Amino acid sequence: VYKRQVLASAECVSSNGFQTKYAKSDENGFVTKDEFINQIDDETIVASLMWGNNETGVIQPIKDISKELKSINSSTLFHSDVVQGIISDNVDFHRNGIESAAISAHKIGGPKGVGAMFVNNKFKLPSFLHGGKQELERRAGTVDVPGIAAFATALQEQQTRFDEEVGLMNDERLIFEDKLKNALSVCLL
């Protein structure tokens, strides 16, 4: 259920001598808690699960999985791609047990090439671009201040419009279901 880019990163880690495991999803793209947790052991360093899938709409049981994961291995970093749910009220990293999260601006109307990463302070990540002290010494180079400002603006606009958009989608769904029911003479449950 992950994007090709994420799978390629997992393959890169594997090619550097680390064991990589994959949890299977059902035909709808849903990963059960048991399937995910069965991949975790006392040597697991990172576990990653996409919160909401942009193609299928499936929302994974992040909170339940993170809680169970920590009962098996408290030192495993739990990462999630949260961009599909970042504007909803449910995205509370701490409450949901997310210790690392990736967010891409263009998915919410912001500029391409800008993103954000949250990492709990208890995890010390090495720099991946060396030579400067920008971005907490994790990524050297000129900071894209206009891009970051545009990302913040897009996020604020999306959060402001969230309830309105959900209401509109629900109204459209009801109209669609009514037209489908009338056209096919069926009952929708």
What do the PLM-derived regions correspond to, one by one?
Residues 3-189:
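Pyridoxal 5′-phosphate
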